[in-house]
C-alpha cells in the first residue's frame, strides 16, 4: 500500500482552490405577469376578501399603502385563485394546502425564468454550471425547488445543490456569502444562484387586531433573481459585473422579538416591531465600519450602497444615520417603488439596477462610477448580512460584450 503525507494532502487541497475573487458574471430577473398598482390595492384587497364593511380598517390600510413609497407590485396570487380557494381570504382560516399548491409549482417556474435570462447573458453552456443555490421563503417540499429547477433547466444531474428555505429578507446576502465560498474553494466552478419568492403564503384577510398582517399585505411583492458566480473568469467569453470582496453575518443584540414569522395552518404569520428601523439605524454604522475599514474606507459617500428596502422607514433611517447623500440609496428606493419588498430576491434586483443604471448613465464603473460598495440584507433574528463588492470598469465590460 502507498503512503501519503500531510504535505501531499495540502498540495491536493491547494490545487482545488480557484485563483482570484468570486465574481458576479451574469444577472437575470423575472416577475409574475399580474401587476397591481399600489394606489388601487386597498380597494382590491378589501373587495376580494369580502371585507368592505370594515370601513375604518380599510381607510387605515389605504394610509399604510400610501406610506410605503411603493408604486406597483407583481403578484402571482390572482383574484381567480382566491375565488377558487376562499378560505385564503379568511384571517388564519386553515388554507395551507391551497397556498402550497400555488407556490410549490410557481416558485421553481418563476426561478426558471430568471435563471434562463442569467444563463443567456452569461453566454456559456448550462453544462458548465457546477453548483446550484436555491432560496425561497415559501413552498417547503421534498424534493425541493432546487431539484425542480434542475429538471426545468435540464442541468446536469450531478450539479451540487443547496436548498435554503425561510431565511427571510437577509437571504439575498446569505446566498452571495455561500456562493463566494463555493466559487473560491472549487477551481473552475460556476455557481447558479436563484432566489424566487411568491408571497401567497403571507396573504391573509384583514383583522383589526393584527395590523402587522396588514403591513405585510401592503409591502411584499413577488419576483425571482438569478446570478452566475465564479472565480477566475475567462475574459474572452465571460463578462464580470462585480467582484465579491468579503462577506459577513451577525445577529443584532436584543432583537429576538423584532421580526418573527411562523408557518401555521392558515399560512405564514408576520410580526414586526415598530422600532425595527431604529434597531437597524443603531447598528448600521458598526456594520459599515467592520466591512469597509479593512479597505481604509471611512467616507460612506465614497462607496455605492445596496440596502435591502425592508420598508421606506429603514432606508430613511440608514440614510440619516450615515449622513448619506440623497442619491446614495436611489437603487434601493427604485426597486422598492417598482416591485415592493421581494424578500430574498430584493437585493439581487438592486445589484441589477445599479449596474444597469451605471451603464445607461455612462458611469466609468458598474458601481455608479465608484470602485467599492456595500450590500446589506436585514432579516428575522435580527440577522444582518453584509457583502462588500468591487465594481468593474465599464470600458472593460463593454470590451467584453456587456
UniProtKB/Swiss-Prot annotation:
Disulfide bonds: none annotated. Pfam families: Chal_sti_synt_C (PF02797), Chal_sti_synt_N (PF00195). The keyword Transferase applies. It catalyses: 2 malonyl-CoA + acetyl-CoA + 2 H(+) = triacetate lactone + 2 CO2 + 3 CoA. It is an enzyme of class 2 (transferase). CDD domains: CHS_like (cd00831). Keywords: Acyltransferase, Transferase. Belongs to the thiolase-like superfamily. Chalcone/stilbene synthases family. This is 2-pyrone synthase. It comes from Gerbera hybrida (Daisy). The gene is 2PS.
Amino acid at each position: 500500500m502507498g503512503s501519503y503525507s500531510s504535505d501531499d494532502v495540502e498540495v491536493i487541497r491547494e490545487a482545488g482552490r480557484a485563483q482570484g475573487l468570486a465574481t458576479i458574471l451574469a444577472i437575470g430577473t423575472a416577475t409574475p405577469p399580474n401587476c397591481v398598482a399600489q394606489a388601487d390595492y386597498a380597494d382590491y384587497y378589501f373587495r376580494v376578501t369580502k371585507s368592505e364593511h370594515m370601513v375604518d380598517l380599510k381607510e387605515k390600510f389605504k394610509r399604510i399603502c400610501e406610506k410605503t413609497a411603493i408604486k406597483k407590485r407583481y403578484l402571482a396570487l390572482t383574484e381567480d385563485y382566491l375565488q377558487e380557494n376562499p378560505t385564503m381570504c379568511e384571517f388564519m382560516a386553515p388554507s395551507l394546502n391551497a397556498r402550497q399548491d400555488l407556490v410549490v409549482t410557481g416558485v421553481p417556474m418563476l426561478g426558471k425564468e430568471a435563471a434562463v435570462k442569467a444563463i443567456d447573458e452569461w453566454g456559456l453552456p448550462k453544462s458548465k454550471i457546477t453548483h446550484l443555490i436555491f432560496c425561497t421563503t415559501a413552498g417547503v417540499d421534498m424534493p425541493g425547488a432546487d431539484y425542480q429547477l434542475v429538471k426545468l433547466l435540464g442541468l446536469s444531474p450531478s450539479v451540487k445543490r443547496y436548498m435554503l428555505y425561510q431565511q427571510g429578507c437577509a437571504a439575498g446576502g446569505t446566498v452571495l456569502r455561500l456562493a463566494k465560498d463555493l466559487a473560491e474553494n472549487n477551481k473552475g466552478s460556476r455557481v447558479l444562484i436563484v432566489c424566487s419568492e411568491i408571497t401567497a403564503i403571507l396573504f391573509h384577510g384583514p383583522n383589526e387586531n393584527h395590523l402587522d398582517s396588514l403591513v405585510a399585505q401592503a409591502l411584499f411583492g413577488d419576483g425571482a433573481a438569478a446570478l452566475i458566480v465564479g472565480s477566475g473568469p475567462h475574459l474572452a467569453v465571460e463578462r464580470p459585473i462585480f467582484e465579491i470582496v468579503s462577506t459577513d453575518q451577525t445577529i443584532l443584540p436584543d432583537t429576538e422579538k423584532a421580526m418573527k414569522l411562523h408557518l401555521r395552518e392558515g399560512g405564514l404569520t408576520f410580526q414586526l416591531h415598530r422600532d425595527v428601523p431604529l434597531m437597524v439605524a443603531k447598528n448600521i454604522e458598526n456594520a459599515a465600519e467592520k466591512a469597509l475599514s479593512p479597505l481604509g474606507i471611512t467616507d460612506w459617500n465614497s462607496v455605492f450602497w445596496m440596502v435591502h428596502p425592508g420598508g421606506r422607514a429603514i432606508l430613511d433611517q440608514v440614510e440619516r444615520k450615515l449622513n448619506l447623500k440623497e442619491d446614495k440609496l436611489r437603487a434601493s428606493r427604485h426597486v422598492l417603488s417598482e416591485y415592493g419588498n421581494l424578500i430574498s430576491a430584493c437585493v439581487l434586483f438592486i445589484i441589477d439596477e445599479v449596474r444597469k443604471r451605471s451603464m445607461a448613465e455612462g458611469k466609468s464603473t458598474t458601481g455608479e462610477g465608484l470602485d467599492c460598495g456595500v450590500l446589506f440584507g436585514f432579516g428575522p433574528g435580527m440577522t444582518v448580512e453584509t457583502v462588500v463588492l468591487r465594481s468593474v470598469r465599464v470600458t472593460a465590460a463593454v470590451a467584453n460584450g456587456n
